[in-house]
Swiss-Prot record:
InterPro entries: Ribosomal_uS19 (IPR002222), Ribosomal_uS19_bac-type (IPR005732), Ribosomal_uS19_CS (IPR020934), Ribosomal_uS19_SF (IPR023575). It holds the Pfam family Ribosomal_S19. NCBIfam families: rpsS_bact (TIGR01050). Protein S19 forms a complex with S13 that binds strongly to the 16S ribosomal RNA. Keywords: Ribonucleoprotein, Ribosomal protein, RNA-binding, rRNA-binding. This is Small ribosomal subunit protein uS19. Signal peptide: none annotated. GO terms for molecular function: rRNA binding; structural constituent of ribosome. Residues 72-91 are annotated as: Disordered. GO terms for biological process: ribosomal small subunit assembly; translation. It comes from Mycoplasma mobile (strain ATCC 43663 / 163K / NCTC 11711). Belongs to the universal ribosomal protein uS19 family. GO terms for cellular component: cytoplasm; small ribosomal subunit.
Length: 91
């Protein structure tokens, strides 16, 4: 179920503070975050975020097309290895 429209978009306060500080200082250093649930705002465009996927941090460069999506959508948590291998099977 989607979030109620009257509540608005969610972004973690600490993440927004980091972005505002980066804008004021004109810093292009990656912003490290564990907040996968935060919505990408237009102010985030052009910044690189290091989003935690449970094991490591994945670099995510934010573009215009990503606005409105969640940061976690661009940091996969699972690796697909495929179903069975043909290698080693005998005919």
């Amino acid at each position: 179920m989607a979030r109620s429209a009257k509540k608005g978009f969610y972004v973690e306060a600490s993440l927004m503070k980091k972005v505002v500080n980066a804008i004021e200082s004109k810093s292009k250093k990656p912003i490290k975050t564990w907040s996968r649930r935060s919505t990408i705002f237009p102010e985030f465009v052009g910044f690189t975020f290091q989003v935690h996927n449970g094991r490591q941090f994945i670099d995510v460069y934010v573009t215009d097309d990503m606005v409105g999506h969640k940061l976690g959508e661009f940091s996969p948590t699972r690796t697909y290895t495929g179903h069975g291998s043909e290698k080693g099977k005998k005919k």
